[in-house]
UniProtKB/Swiss-Prot annotation:
Pfam families: ATP-synt_8. It is a single-pass membrane protein. The keyword Cell division does not apply. GO terms for molecular function: proton transmembrane transporter activity. It comes from the Eukaryota. InterPro entries: ATP8_mammal, ATP8_metazoa. The modification N6-succinyllysine is found at K54. The chain crosses the membrane at residues 8-24. This is ATP synthase F(0) complex subunit 8. The modification N6-acetyllysine is found at K54, K57. It is found in: Mitochondrion membrane.
Amino acid sequence: MPQLDTSTWFTIIMAMLPTLYLITQLKLLSMNYYQPPLTKNPNLQTHNTCWRPKWTKTYLPHSQPQQS
């Protein structure tokens, strides 16, 4: 049975590593990552609504104690 010639394996592996690294970097560069939303200046958006100038809250009535 003939012996397996492994004399070129080191050269092939050492050439493969930078190639895989380069391919991975190019793949990562082409990906679109999520961009966080930009902070908006609240002074830029002004709407003329009737509830904008006043502060209103709606309260529920207090619950009555249970009668037993």
